[in-house]
A protein has these predicted regions:
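Acidic, His/Gly-rich catalytic cores of divalent-metal-dependent hydrolytic chemistry
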Residues: 257
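Hard-cation-handling environments
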Residues: 123-252
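His/Asp/Glu-rich metal-coordinating catalytic cores
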Residues: 1-155, 159-162, 179
Length: 257
């Protein structure tokens, strides 16, 4: 799945940032043609060192790296989820004792709200906005976060229309293509079947003609269809916005917070 998602994300980056990079579609195609797909726990040896990938539990196909050389073991992670999510099982930490660990620390200095509490807050807010005949806009990352938010709402018994837009729809197709990576593929398939897909401007206008929940990239409000929804919904007090993604410094989402 990482192979498919990488191509999708890089192409989207080029589309948004246009001529700001020294590479384009031909270079991407060349990179993909020379790429090798490696499965989890598949040991690769180079010289006197070996490495293998383990599931990070963060996004589908997301990996940590276990490196061994000269009887020493190093464990390297990017984003990692030790508890798992509605979509994915937790990170694979069946790795034994390590000599060194290098890990991300995005929230290491923060006390995060318990997951059940944050999910309940989102569900309650969604119902509150719908009850006052408004639309709830949830800007969200295309990969995993959009799908997770939809799963939280639908699995809670939320019976109102949920719309999904943008690149998240293509990511849905990738996730459905690799059910063996998902925690419960049948539940996820049911969620996607209940979500209303919006693919063009006319469908967006029709979608906003009645109270609903809209899930759309970009998660930090940097471009994407999120800009359209924000402009359409921000001047009506009945509507609401829920920021469920990390907001980087200098982004519109961070300023809104």
């Amino acid at each position: 799945p990482t192979f498919d998602l990488s191509k999708l994300l890089i192409q989207d980056m080029i589309k948004i940032e246009k001529n700001s990079h020294s590479f384009g579609v031909p270079e991407i195609d060349n990179m993909m043609a020379k790429s090798k797909i490696i499965g989890f726990k598949e040991k690769i040896t180079r010289g006197n060192a070996s490495f293998e990938l383990r599931s990070s539990g963060h996004v589908i196909g997301g990996s940590t790296v276990l490196v061994e050389s000269k009887n020493k073991k190093l464990f390297y992670t990017g984003d990692i989820n030790l508890r798992g999510s509605r979509l994915l099982p937790p990170a694979d930490l069946d790795i034994g004792e390590m000599d060194m660990v290098i890990t991300e620390s995005t929230y290491s200095q923060e006390n995060q709200m318990p997951r059940k509490e944050s999910e309940k807050g989102l569900i309650d807010f969604a119902n509150e906005v719908i009850d006052r005949k408004g639309t709830l806009f949830i800007p969200s990352f295309s990969v995993e976060r959009s799908q997770e938010v939809a799963s939280v709402l639908i699995n809670s018994g939320f019976n109102h229309k949920i719309i999904m837009d943008g690149m998240a729809l293509k990511v849905n197709e990738v996730l459905l293509k690799y059910p063996e990576y998902l925690r419960n593929p049948e539940i996820f398939k049911d969620v996607i079947e209940k979500v209303v897909s919006v693919r063009d401007h006319n469908e967006r206008k029709r979608a906003l003609s009645e109270p609903c929940v809209v899930i759309s990239p970009a998660g930090m409000l940097v471009g994407g269809n999120a800009v359209y929804y924000l402009q359409e919904l921000s001047f009506n007090d009945k509507n609401g916005i829920a920021l469920v993604s990390y907001q980087g410094e200098g982004t519109p989402g961070k300023k809104l917070l």
